[in-house]
Design a protein with these regions (language model features):
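N-terminal subdomain of nucleotide-sugar transferases
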Residues: 1-45, 50, 54, 221, ...
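Conserved donor-binding/catalytic core segment of Leloir-type glycosyltransferases
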Residues: 4, 194-211, 217-221
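Short acidic/histidine- and often glycine-rich active-site loop of Leloir-type glycosyltransferases
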Residues: 121, 169, 239-240, 293-308
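Donor nucleotide-sugar binding/catalytic pocket of nucleotide-sugar-dependent glycosyltransferases
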Residues: 135-184
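Conserved acidic donor-binding segment of nucleotide-sugar-dependent glycosyltransferases
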Residues: 249, 302-303, 307-314, 321-328
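Aromatic "clamp/platform" in nucleotide-sugar-dependent glycosyltransferases that forms part
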Residues: 271
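Short hydrophobic beta-strand element within catalytic cores of glycosyltransferases
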Residues: 288-292
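A short, well-ordered alpha-helix in the C-terminal region of glycosyltransferases
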Residues: 330-352
C-alpha cells in the first residue's frame, strides 16, 4: 500500500500537525512495509527526507514558515505520478482541493484529517460572518472526502454541528519510549537559577492567541515567586512576569522530553485544543497536567492524572495549580504514565490508522462511508 499525506502545514515549528506527520512517517518506515510519501508546500521544489516531496508555495504573511500551495496542475500531476493507493489531506488549504482532484482522477479514496478548529478561530478573530463562511468552506471540502478523521470526540461533535458527516475518531498517540520518566534531570532548577523548593511548571507550544498565553501568564503572576513557569516555544508573548522564563522552540525530541520530565507538571490554558498531543507527551514523561476544561482536554486528562480549570480565568487556573500541589504529584504522574500506556501509545494510534487506510483501499468506493462505523 502507498499512502500519501498532503499538507501546507510543514516545518518543525508549525505545531502538532507537522509533528504528527513526521512521527507517522518514521513509524511507517520502521514498523511496516507501507510506502509513505508526503507532498508539502515549500519555498522551492525538491525532495526532502524519507519520501517527502516539495512543491513551491507562496509565503503567507504573518504565518511563519507556512506557504500557500499554487499551480494546481503541477500538484495534481505530481500526485498522479506518485500513484498512491490512498490520500490523507491534513488541512483544508488549496493542496487539499488539488488532492481531491487527483483522487478522483486516480479513483482512490481521500481521507480528510480535521486537525484544526478553524471555525472557532474565525469567530474569535473576525466575527460571526467569518464563522459562517468558514463553516460553509469546511463543509464543502470535507463532505467531498470519503472519510473524515477527527482526533477527538470533541472535534467529531464540532464537525457534526457544521453538517459534516462520515466522521470517524482516531486519537493521536505519543512515542512512550522517547517521552519517558527516565528522561528526568535533577539539575533543571539549578540551570534556571531557582531554589530546589521552587514549584516548577512547564508550557510547551506556540505562543498564539488560541493557546491563551495571557491567561497563563496572569495566573503565574497571581501565584507569585514560589511558582516558576518555563515557557518553551515560538511566537510573540506579552511582557513576562518575573517568575516566567522563556526558552526558544526545541526541535530535538530528547531535549524536549528531558525538559518536560524535569518539571513538576505541564500547564496549558488553551481551551480549543482539538486533541492536545503535548498533554500526552507530559503524561508519558510521568508528569501530571493542569489544563483548561475546554476542547478535548477532558478526553485525555482525568482526575487521576491532573486537574482541569475553568477556561479563560487566570484565577481559576491558579487555583487548579494550587490544587495540584495539594495532592501527591508523583502518584498523579505515575497514573498519567499508566493512562498513556493503556490508551494513547503511538503504536496503538498508528495501528488503528493503518487499519483505516487498509480498509479504505480494500473497500469498493461506494462502501467506504461504512468505515465510519469502525
Amino acid at each position: 500500500m502507498h499512502l500519501l499525506d498532503v499538507t501546507m502545514l510543514h516545518g518543525p515549528a508549525v505545531g502538532g500537525v507537522s509533528r504528527y506527520l513526521s512521527t507517522k512517517r518514521r513509524w511507517m518506515r520502521d514498523n511496516t512495509r507501507v510506502q509513505h510519501s508526503q507532498l508539502v508546500a515549500a519555498a522551492r521544489a525538491g525532495r526532502g527526507e524519507d519520501g517527502e516531496y516539495l512543491l513551491p508555495g507562496l509565503r503567507i504573511p504573518l504565518c511563519g514558515p507556512l506557504r500557500w500551495p499554487i499551480d494546481p496542475m503541477r500538484w495534481v500531476d505530481t500526485i498522479r505520478r506518485l500513484r498512491p493507493d490512498v490520500i490523507e489531506a491534513n488541512d483544508v488549504g488549496s493542496a487539499a482541493w488539488f488532492a481531491l482532484a487527483a483522487a478522483h482522477k486516480l479513483d482512490i479514496p481521500l481521507l480528510g484529517f480535521a486537525h484544526v478548529d478553524l471555525v472557532r478561530f474565525a469567530r474569535e478573530r473576525k466575527g460571526m460572518l467569518a464563522e459562517r463562511v468558514v463553516i460553509g468552506y469546511m463543509r464543502a471540502f470535507y463532505n467531498r472526502c470519503d472519510v473524515v478523521i477527527a482526533p477527538s470526540q470533541y472535534m467529531r461533535t464540532r464537525l457534526a454541528g457544521w453538517g459534516i458527516d462520515r466522521v470517524v475518531v482516531r486519537h493521536l498517540g505519543v512515542d512512550a519510549t522517547q517521552f519517558h520518566p527516565r528522561s528526568r534531570s535533577t539539575n533543571l532548577r539549578a540551570r534556571l537559577g531557582l531554589a530546589e523548593s521552587t514549584r516548577l511548571l512547564i508550557y510547551v507550544g506556540r505562543f498564539s492567541a488560541e493557546k491563551r498565553i495571557g491567561v497563563l501568564l496572569d495566573s503565574l503572576q497571581a501565584l507569585g515567586p514560589r511558582h516558576h513557569l518555563l515557557l518553551v516555544g515560538a511566537g510573540d508573548t506579552p511582557p513576562l512576569p518575573s517568575n516566567v522564563t522563556r526558552m526558544p522552540f526545541v526541535a530535538n525530541t530528547g531535549v524536549l522530553a528531558r525538559l518536560i520530565a524535569s518539571a513538576d507538571a505541564l500547564v496549558h490554558a488553551g481551551d480549543v485544543e482539538t486533541f492536545g498531543l503535548v498533554y500526552l507527551e507530559a503524561m508519558a514523561c510521568g508528569r501530571p497536567v493542569v489544563a483548561a476544561a475546554g476542547g478535548a482536554a477532558s478526553e485525555i486528562v482525568d482526575a487521576n492524572c491532573g486537574v482541569l480549570a475553568r477556561p479563560g480565568s487566570p484565577a481559576a487556573l491558579a487555583e487548579a495549580i494550587e490544587a495540584l500541589y495539594a495532592r501527591d504529584i508523583d502518584a498523579l504522574g505515575a497514573n498519567a504514565r499508566a493512562r498513556v500506556e493503556a490508551h494513547f501509545t503511538l503504536d496503538l494510534s498508528m495501528h488503528r490508522l493503518l487499519a483505516l487506510y487498509r480498509t479504505a483501499v480494500a473497500a469498493p468506493q461506494a462502501s467506504v462511508p461504512a468505515l465510519v462505523a469502525t
